Amino acid sequence: MSVRLRQIVEALGGTIEGGGGDVEILRIAPLESAEPGDLAFLSNPRYRQQLAASRAACVIVAPAMREEALARGACIVAEDPYAYFARATQLWKRLHGRTPAAGVHPSAVVDPDAFVDPSAHIGPLCVVERGARIGAGTVLTSRITVGEGCRIGERCLLHPGVVIGADGFGFAAEGGAWTKIEQLGAVRIGDDVEIGANTCIDRGALDDTVIEDGVKLDNLVQIGHNVHIGRHTAVAGCTGVSGSTRIGARCMIGGAAMILGHLEIADGVQVSPGTAITRSVLKPGLYSGMFPFDENAKWEKNAATLRQLHGLRARIMALEEQIRKDGPTAHIQ
């Protein structure tokens, strides 16, 4: 099914340049591999060479790239091409009827004491336990568990295998063994949240674990009990957040990051992939803590040197102290 450029611009705004609104779009494609009939986008001027070579029927560009885009053919001029592309994908999905229909799949299990909004979609093999609430327009794709008393807001999207409200990891050491701390809280998820496949969000021990509006969690993310994640924060795959940590709004957490428990992360913090956050971060900015990879032989030498840093530091401090006592010229031959 094709879509005319005019339909896209009428729905999303922007301006068509260098071509008529009757140009037919067959699909949305990457700039470098687009074919005639495709709609592509360019958000980074570094890739302008791909623009000149692209065979796309139309390219979404910023005003600064308008002239270069017109030199090759039709374009849609938008202030933020990447955001425009994102909204174009949503429009494409709506027009092609890929939005899940409201209702509960016959294989899903919904407790009689749970509430599911009539406009929500509960997919195959999902389980919604007692007292849980699923908001309007929310989609549970398949094999998802929403635990007792947990609440999910409106227009959320949960991908296969998500578990909401399993017990948090809480045990007390007693007599050489572990005594379980019953997890008496729940999970509260706001509106417009997306949760990737096989991500787990544990219920709180006493208070609830909270995921605020607009949060995006990638696949295989572990959120511990009593964590609080602020609005519009994005967390990439394989990240673990330990219990009772508070992450602010509009943060970006890179893949495979590790965040210890009982920490405070300010609004607007960015964490590089693979970074271990071991103390609170109280100022916005980009934080990194990775040991660079190298050829193994070089890495082993660097690692051996790293183990000696404390001793080397002590020796340097002793030398500096000796120079301070003797004067800066005493050791010059």
Swiss-Prot record:
GO cellular component: membrane
UniProt keyword Nuclease, yes or no: no
The entry's keywords: Acyltransferase, Lipid A biosynthesis, Lipid biosynthesis, Lipid metabolism, Repeat, Transferase
UniProt-listed InterPro entries: Hexapep, Hexapep_transf_CS, LpxD, Trimer_LpxA-like_sf, UDP_GlcNAc_AcTrfase_non-rep
PROSITE patterns in UniProt: HEXAPEP_TRANSFERASES (PS00101)
Entry EC no(s): 2.3.1.191
Pfam families according to UniProt: Hexapep, Hexapep_2, LpxD
Organism superkingdom: Bacteria
SUPFAM superfamilies registered for this protein in UniProt: Trimeric LpxA-like enzymes
A GO biological-process term: lipid A biosynthetic process
Pathway in which this enzyme or protein is active: Bacterial outer membrane biogenesis; LPS lipid A biosynthesis
Catalysed reactions listed for this entry: a UDP-3-O-[(3R)-3-hydroxyacyl]-alpha-D-glucosamine + a (3R)-hydroxyacyl-[ACP] = a UDP-2-N,3-O-bis[(3R)-3-hydroxyacyl]-alpha-D-glucosamine + holo-[ACP] + H(+)
Active-site positions on this chain: H225
GO molecular function: N-acyltransferase activity
Description of how the protein assembles with itself and partners: Homotrimer.
Protein family: Belongs to the transferase hexapeptide repeat family. LpxD subfamily.
Function: Catalyzes the N-acylation of UDP-3-O-acylglucosamine using 3-hydroxyacyl-ACP as the acyl donor. Is involved in the biosynthesis of lipid A, a phosphorylated glycolipid that anchors the lipopolysaccharide to the outer membrane of the cell.
NCBIfam families: lipid_A_lpxD, PRK00892.1
Protein name from the UniProt record: UDP-3-O-acylglucosamine N-acyltransferase
